[in-house]
Each structure stands twice: as C-alpha cells, then as structure tokens.
Amino acid sequence: MHPDQIRQLRLQESSNTHPNLAILFIFIALAAVIVLLICLLSVILLLRYTRHGRILLKNTNPGELDDEALENEHIDEEGFSLLDDMGKERYLQAREFELNSMKSNVNTDAKLLDFLQVQEKGVLAWHFIPNQEYNCYVKNKTELSFLGNEECCMQTNLPLQRINEVYYFEVKLLDVPIDTLVSIGLATKPYPPFRLPGWNFWSTAYVSDGTRRSNSPFTGKPYSSFYQQGDVIGVGYKPKCNRIFFTRNGRRCAELPCTYRNLYPTVGAIGPCTLHVNLGQAGYVFIEANIKKWRLAPAVGSLAPPPSYSTSQPTISWDAASESSAGTTTQGDTNRPDKSKNRSPPINFDGTSYDAAGNVFSPSSSNNQAYQMHSMPATDEV
C-alpha cells in the first residue's frame, strides 16, 4: 500500500476515536456528579434524623409542640395585628395562662377513683363543669347554657378513655342566635376558661362558621359547611392513632390529627345559646356510632350501687313478735321451769338502751327513731 494511503487511513482512525473519547468523558462526568449528589443527600438525611437535640415544631397540629418550645415561641406579629383590642388582650391572657400551667405541672391523668366511678355509673359518670365566672351553667349534667356575650367554654370532669378504638359524642344546637359563634371539639386540661376550643395549644374544634381550628388563635382553615340552630355536630376520637373526626347531621367529615395527651370534650361559645350534649346516654344521629357502640362508656354501670341508708325502714314491733312466739309454744315448753324470775333486768345507762346484738340506741339517735325499742315481756326460755 502506498504510504500516502496509509497516512490517510491513520488520520481517519484518529478522527473517529476523538468523538468516542468525548462521549465517554461526558458519561463519566455525569456519573460522578450523580454519585456526588447521592452522597451529599445521604449525609444531609443522616444528620437530620440522627442528630440529638430538642425538636422544635410549629403549632400546626395539637401535640406537636413541646413545653420548652411553647415558652420560647415568638408571637406571630402578622396574625396578632389582625386581632382587635379585645382579641389581643385575650390572646396575651391565654398565653400567660398556658405558661403558668406548664410551670405548675398539673397532673391530668385519670385516678383510680375516676375508673371506679365509670365502672359504677357508666356513661353517667361524665358531666360538664359550669363556668359561672363567665355565665356558663349546666343543667342535668349535659345541658349547657351560655348566657353572656363573652368568649368562654366548658369541659367535662373526666377525660376520654383510651381502651376502645373510637369514642364519640354529639352536640345538638337547641337555641343558637345567628350572631352567636359556637366551637365544639376536644382540649386538654387545664385549658383557659375564657377561650374557645381550637384557639389554644392542644385543642381541636369545628367552628360554626364552617372552619376548623387546631391551635389557631388567629384564623381558621376551611373544613366543612357552617352549622346553626337545629344541627347536630358529632366528635369522634381515635386514641390508638391520635386522630379526630367530626360529623354534621350524621355525615362524616375529614379526619384531623390531635395530641397524645388526655383530651376532654369541650364546648365553647361567643354569645348566648343553649346546647345539649349526648355522651352516649341516648341514641346518636350518626348511625355508625350506634351500630359500633362508640359511646364513652356503657349506658349502665357494671358495679351495683351501694345500699341507701337515708331511707326510713319499717318499725319493728317486738311486742307482736313476742305474742306470736308465745302462741306457738309447745307442751314441752310449758313443763319447763320458769326462769324468768332469775332473769336480770335490761341494761340501761343514762337513758341508753342496748338490743340483743349489742347495738346502742340513744334517745337522740336517728336509728332509735327508725327502729323503736319496746320492752319485751318475760317468756319461758331454756
């Protein structure tokens, strides 16, 4: 082959190898960049989820804020500016109330006496505590009356249990003017009595304007349609997964997260209104709650009530008893010697009488009035 031809072939081969090397270099560079990004992302995730320290969470959901973060939390200036003078004052009062409650370490766990009360009375062990300072009153344990125009709320005496999968209760709006704002939900204790549920930490509520609030002192988020007089609002609590849902006239709404702390049924209002709470003492509007028995406790307690000592018992006449016993004496009894003459007289010290069992009955005793004592005639005894 001619040398010129050989030179041309070599030039063609070298020109063909240069593009291949460039493509190979590009692939190697891309692979290196991808590996570097993966390593960097792995390091970031490793540092984020393995680093020890205090976790600071926002107040988006109940229970997602620790006590130290609550103390160090800064006021949302933008939301605070949207409040009126009364709202700003209430917000600052509620914040001070929460900080004082956090420092006092109030124990809200259910006590043994509470469990015994639930076993004995069933669902009737729950009742709402009146808030008379803000003109909030309770009738028949579950009929709530808000008489003032101030913001206030009422809570039950016992928290919801954590044994069953779901606990449910309903609130019927009996008399609610148009300009009254009602908030129904769950909250922890101690909770500011001058605030609605959902406005402060560790509380969630469905508001009558159609919004829902979870630790939202400034604004609420759209949730469902508004409710008014005649509607029935239900609250369902799932303690196993810390979730809460609401119902409106028997129709279920979306679920929301809630805190792991002890929660109490809480109802609040701004303005006069009358509400009735069904904790399970009657049937629900929500059919599923009736079928699955989601009431707070059995309608009837499992323990028998103690005997009543206040009722008066029938008077026992010992004269009639002695006469009947004397009439049934046998012939053998009449032949026995008479020992009544040797019987000692009844013991009586300072007007105090003793019965056969040794029980004391003073003249001023209430038992003496219920069980009148009579002198027993002498009879033949062995």
From Swiss-Prot:
GO BP terms: protein transport to vacuole involved in ubiquitin-dependent protein catabolic process via the multivesicular body sorting pathway
InterPro entries xrefs: B30.2/SPRY, B30.2/SPRY_sf, ConA-like_dom_sf, SPRY_dom, SPRY_Ssh4-like, Ubq-SigPath_Reg
Listed Polar residues bias regions: 309-334, 361-372
CDD domains: SPRY_SSH4_like
Disulphides: none
SMART domains listed in its UniProt record: SPRY (SM00449)
Record carries keyword Cytoplasm: yes
Annotated ranges, domain B30.2/SPRY: 79-284
Topology versus the membrane: Single-pass membrane protein
Main location: cytoplasm
TM helices/strands, residue ranges: 21-41
Pfam families registered for this protein in UniProt: SPRY
Record region (Disordered): 304-382
Keywords: Cytoplasm, Membrane, Transmembrane, Transmembrane helix
Compartments it resides in: Cytoplasm; Membrane
GO cellular component, one term: cytoplasm
Domain of life: Eukaryota
Keyword Transferase attributed: no
Name listed for the protein in its UniProt record: SPRY domain-containing protein C285.10c
Annotated organism of origin: Schizosaccharomyces pombe (strain 972 / ATCC 24843) (Fission yeast)
